[in-house]
Amino acid sequence: LMSGAVKMGMDFRLIGPKQYWPAGPFYEECLKVAKETGIRISFIDSYTEEKVQDLTVATDNLEAGEKLGKFAATLLGPDDQIAIVAHVKGVSTAVEREEGFRKGLGDLAKNIVEVVYCDSQYEKSRKLTQELMEKYPNLKMVAGMNEYSSVGAARAVKAAGAKDRIQVVGVDSSQEAVQLMENGVFKGLVVQKAFKMGYIGVKETILMLRGKSYEKDINSGCELVTPDNMYDSEIEKLLFPFNTLKLS
């Protein structure tokens, strides 16, 4: 798609990079060429190590991970084992959320027994979590780093009848994630402001293309959602953005 944009002479591209490190054809053949030919680049949600973009709108993933880690620490004992189910190895969101999660856990980070990657596939996350529960019979927490990994992990814990023994926390939400929280499987989710992220990304890109002043690095924010606050009005707007959207 990016190489096609270069050939067609497009003015800009909105991109959500899948890999943090720039190695490989995606950077060499696409982003670098686009930059050299004058195509403006806006990164949404994630970014690359090489700073080729003109603007970025994303959650501060270190902050999101740390927020999740601090909450997780309140649920754990000093020796409780923790496993992380992340999404795609090397993508900026996975790298930074895990780093933030470890920071938020503080001394409890030493109890992380393993980190696995589900490649943003529900079924792979479920199977990996099932294997983790079998491998570590004393496991007390599974932390997902995106919606796929979080929901897949929660499915496995629910299927095993282990929701009271193994705490599940994660990042991102969906209708199923909300239902899993209502059913007592999820103890906490850090939810991104995805609607805001996309809206601001398009808005600031238009300002940039019109030669007007625009923000180059925007943190779209996130919130901790628990069974105790999930029906607060502001939290409902994050969980059900289109149900609560008012059009004028």
Regions found by a protein language model. Give the residues of each.
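Structural recognition of the beta-strand scaffold that forms the well-ordered cores
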Residues: 40-43, 58, 81-85, 114, ...
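Extracytoplasmic ligand-binding site segments that recognize negatively charged/polar headgroups
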Residues: 60-61, 84-101, 117-124
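Flexible loop/hinge segments that line or gate small-molecule binding clefts
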Residues: 38-63, 71-74, 81, 174-187, ...
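Hinge/cleft segment of the Venus flytrap/periplasmic-binding protein
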Residues: 85, 89, 93, 104-106, ...
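A short helix->loop->beta-strand "cap" motif at the edges of active sites that frequently abuts
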Residues: 10, 37-40, 80, 162-166
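Hydrophobic alpha-helical
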Residues: 32-36, 101, 112-114, 119-180
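Hydrophobic alpha-helical segments within soluble ligand-binding/sensing domains
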Residues: 57-82, 96, 124-126, 174-177, ...
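Glycine-rich phosphate/diphosphate-binding loop of Rossmann-like nucleotide-binding domains
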Residues: 1-34, 105
